[in-house]
């Protein structure tokens, strides 16, 4: 029988975050929707520019009602982004505080079961550091970094979809350019790291 290796790093953080699974999932979904909504103003600007170019140089032929509707669309996108991101942060903070509470209660109940000599040997400063600082780091990840990580993964996908839907040739050229830039950067930093 092989012992299962305890999880560390990001895997352990996700395991702790999943103790409040419904709130974490709600935060991830809302953060993804906020990332999508953040692109709505750019889409509205694209449609406005397209409409202006369609009638240029006779700008009097512009339909002001459609321009105003695109303006409202942009404003709605900004508002939706703010509301959805706020809701995502609310869910992630509720999950983080619930997880912190459980971690502290479990840690302190475990401390109550260990021999008194352990407390003397370790010292109160180290125990306080664990309860205050180390457990608080979990809150930073669940409450703040998790929604931002999700948005950081969703945003490039949404941007790629928008680029490809506007003009697949220019979108593909843009995506290939970004990929080449990442390859060059990794090669350059790889050599720099090898020198050290």
Predicted regions located by residue number:
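A short amphipathic helical element positioned immediately N-terminal to and/or at the very start
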Residues: 5-24, 126-127, 131
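Membrane-interfacial segments
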Residues: 49-57, 95-96, 100, 115, ...
